[in-house]
Structure formats: C-alpha cells, structure tokens
Amino acid sequence: MAEEVEEERLKYLDFVRAAGVYAVDSFSTLYLYAKDISGPLKPGVDTIENVVKTVVTPVYYIPLEAVKFVDKTVDVSVTSLDGVVPPVIKQVSAQTYSVAQDAPRIVLDVASSVFNTGVQEGAKALYANLEPKAEQYAVITWRALNKLPLVPQVANVVVPTAVYFSEKYNDVVRGTTEQGYRVSSYLPLLPTEKITKVFGDEAS
C-alpha cells in the first residue's frame, strides 16, 4: 500500500494536485451549505445531484491522469537536459527554486503582520524581512551568473549605470519628501552603497 501511495506522488506538479484537492474541498463545503439552506428546493437539488454524479463519475480521474502524464513528460525532459545544461545554470536554477519555495511563507508572515498591526507596520515588517533575504539571494545569483562568459564585461557597463540612476531616484525621493509630499515619505531609498559593494566588487 505504501508503494502505491509513493507511486501516486507527482515529482514536479504536486502543487497542481494539491490545488485541485483544495478547490474541490472548498466547492464541496460551499455546495453542502447551499444544499442545506435550499429549503423546499432540496428534492430538486438531490435529483440534479444524482444526474451530475452519473455523468461525472466516469471522467472523474481523467484530469489527474493528464497531470500525471505531464509530470512524467517534464521528468523525462529534465532528465535528458540534465547532462547538457552547464553546472552553473543548474546552480542558479536551484537557487531560484529555493527562493520561490520561501515565497509562500513570507507572504503568510506579511499577511498576518498586516492583519495584526495594520498596513504601514506590515509594510515595514515586510521590508525588514525581505531586505536581508533579497540581498543574500542577489549576491548568490550574481556570483553564479558572473561565472558565465561575457557577464563580467556587461556588468562593468551596467553596474555604474544602475548606481547612477539609483542615486537620481534617491535624490528625487528626498527632494519631494522635503517639499512635503507625503507619498514620497513611504517610498524606500535604494541602497546605492550596497549595490556598489556587492555588484561592483564582483564585476571588477
């Protein structure tokens, strides 16, 4: 039995199955509630429900089989590409996947923070949580990309330009804040020193 359960798990698209189960469960709960409050229409609802069950039951497992097929196709493609893709690109994609896995947890933290403390405090908490993580992943990704051909040469041009425009943006935000525009006081300043330190040092 345990082998069958393990066989049912999808390697890449398990989130699709989980979303489907959640959607069906939510719809079922809503449907049962509506059915309970239908009052005199309940016998008609039961008749329609039996007809729908008769029609849907034969095709119920087709979407799951389609997702399994796509999952196996993705697995075959990934396995065949595994020997062709350079290790640097594999490393970058693994790090990107790791960042993507952290996203739902961060969103839940922010949502609970906004609910408990309000929007402004929630936004500050979001920035405080995201800034170190974003900086860490930017450095990791940058170092991995910097190993690819031509990236260091392009970086020598792009990094100074990014720093220049970041400083211009910061000047505009500071200026409009001093002039009394409240919206500007909520805009974050870009950390030009960090950009120069992280990306400039790596580019040279």
From Swiss-Prot:
Organism, as annotated: Hevea brasiliensis
Induction trigger: Induced by tapping. Not induced by wounding, ethephon or abscisic acid treatment. Induced by ethylene.
Name by which UniProt lists this protein: Small rubber particle protein
Tissue localization of expression: Highly expressed in the specialized vessel laticifers, but localized only in the laticifer layers in the conducting phloem. Also detected in leaves.
Pfam family, one: REF
Key word Cell membrane present: no
InterPro entries in alphabetical order: REF
Any one GO cellular component localisation term in the record: cytoplasm
KW Cytoplasm (keyword) present: yes
Protein task: Involved in the biosynthesis of rubber, an isoprenoid polymer (cis-1,4-polyisoprene).
Post-translational modification note: Not glycosylated.
Compartments where found: Cytoplasm
Lineage: Eukaryota, Viridiplantae, Streptophyta, Embryophyta, Tracheophyta
PANTHER family: REF/SRPP-LIKE PROTEIN OS05G0151300/LOC_OS05G05940, REF_SRPP-LIKE PROTEIN OS05G0151300_LOC_OS05G05940
Signal peptide: none
